[in-house]
Amino acid sequence: MNKNEHFKSGFVAVVGRPNVGKSTLINALIGDKIAIVSDKAQTTRNRIICVYTDESKQIVFMDTPGVHKPKHKLGEFMVDAAIESLKETEAVLFVVAGNEKRGPGDNFIIEQLKRVKVPVFLVVNKIDTLKKEELLEAIVSYQDAYPFAGVIPISAKDKENLSEILKVLEETLPEGPQYFPEDMITDQPERLIISDIVREKILLATRDEIPHAIAVDVDEMKTRDDGTTYIRATIYCERDSHKGIIIGTKGALLTQLGAEARADIQKRLATKVYLDLWVKVKKDWRNKSGMLSELGYRK
């Protein structure tokens, strides 16, 4: 595809506090659902590579877990993954929620950014909720703390001003090779994408005490003789009470979660899917390094 002798390419880290819209932004830029989205903080756990390619450029976005003060080994893993990504980029997008005051979490990230030697752009998200003077106040607050290479106000939800991000990055990135085929949009293994789809449905359906105490592992995936893709997945939680909530009265919630996840998986695989979900209790799994490794969490 790359016939442009001035083709631009490079890696761009997308960082920010939990729940500021990083994954929504990535999905909107790529035009596909790669990173799962919910209104719960710390939805993204792994660093996810998402690739945008057109005739003049290839931008490799690294969607990172939200930076927060870790409370367990999983939290430490998530923060390490986010900070590590800053060392491997040609540019950084620091995403903030324009409708929230700059806080300790933002200040922690800014301290990390001070060690970065590449251009850092402030992306002010959720401008659809702001008046002009509120937006200006938010921008000034962050500019007082760090010398950003530029400021890009956007609404990831409404896909407003996203083209400006692509334009600015094309101007910033160096001339370089096309690292990935033009039809590749992520480095995520198929099984991990499927497990994230199931986890997303749980995040959206359950109350606050459950989301970060659950993980999903795809145990088996095979094509049956009739062409149906059979997927067996286990949902791990830390308490018996969580297991009861996920299953629901007479299995109602688990059935609902399965139906919603199956619909999304079928769209991605473009085939009929039989999704077989199981729920198991693994006490304190978030503090067990071996379990985290088995579940695919990697730096």
Task: Give, region by region, the residue ranges found by the protein language model.
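P-loop NTP-binding site
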Residues: E190-K299
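Conserved C-terminal guanine-recognition region of P-loop GTPase G domains, centered on the G4
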Residues: Y52-Q58, F77-V151, A205, K222-D225
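Conserved glycine(s) of the Walker
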Residues: G21, N161, L253
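Canonical P-loop GTPase G-domain recognition
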Residues: P119, D128-E190
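Active-site glycine-centered loops adjacent to acidic/histidine catalytic or metal-binding residues
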Residues: D63, N125, S155
